[in-house]
Amino acid sequence: FDPRFEEALLLLADGRAILAVGNEGAVYAEFAARGVEIVLCPSLSLMGQSRKLGHTVPDFLRSAGVVEGDRVGVVGWKSFEPEEWESSTPAIAAPAFLVDALREAVGSSNLVTDATRVLMDSTSGLRAVSGPDQLAAFEWAAARASACVERVTTSIRPGMTEHEAVAAMGYAGEPLSAHIMFASGPEVAIGLRSPTERTIELGDAVTTAVGFWGGLCARAGLLANGPEDLRAESEGYLERMAIPYWRAIATWYETMRIGVRGDEIQAAVEAALAGAFSPALNPGHLIHLDEWLDSPIRPESTETIASGMALQCDIIPDSTGPGWAANCEDTVAIADQALRRDLARIHPELWARISARRRFMEEQLGIVLADEVLPFSSAPARFSPFWLDPERALAYRS
């Protein structure tokens, strides 16, 4: 169950699971939620809707057994580092009206604390590692996302509008983890934006991304057949941007393994870039139903990669020249021998796809993977800098 249009509140205590929902969520929860008590709380509904039936938020908390003196942990959207917060009242990234009602119910602000890391911490969070069935769902999402992106990058032509280019992805209504992204021309640096009616031109920088629950794929490059189509401002793109970028992508994959520290991955990526540019954000992060869960990959991080993690290889350049763009983002999972055995036994078709992808990366791209690295994208690490020549991709020399 995921709330749509409204907030929802799941309360767990004394062996009970109680889900408070608004007017629209009440109908959806009956269909989508399992193993929980569903309670109507119309204050969670949109403005202007009826509040006549159901509970107020304080009434719901009382009926659920929240009383003065209770300690309550709240899982919000994210947690904060100690240096980010100066108040003695715990910082909680959840709707204020819910947090205020909880504090009133237990009689003290300090009895309501942030418990977000119980689920989302990059090493100890319950959602940081997944079992074989959840990983199988993520593999579907990642493979589907990469197929959508490939259809866009291989069918795009000068003269199309951005909307026409993105229509090639074949979106079929699946839940998204991020807005569908596409940008071209001088605004390509704003990779987060949605497609427009802009007409795409030969030599444009182009970028696109598609993400479903559990997997995202992104690619960026130039709308050209090769260097001969480049504008003056794009001179040197291949040597100074595309090749160092892909070298960092390949290094990320070859460094990834169980037990490697986050700062080791960060350092390896920065060394591979050799000063050409730096990662704008963490060069990789955990992914789940949400596109970014947390990241163990950052400077000075002693957190280690563990079996069961689903990760994005996500290196965003911190600077680009005019008309330049490079991106090659895909999803992988990390699995020890026992988890690999379970995946192969329970999901043999998935395992066959993973095995084929590993062979492709090693035999065609020259990237050597640890046994525990399982590519989920249909074209892992395949980076074609010139979109009008999709058959040509960067690889290590054999």
Language-model regions: role of each:
Residues 1-398:
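Active-site neighborhoods and metal-handling regions in enzymes and metal-associated proteins
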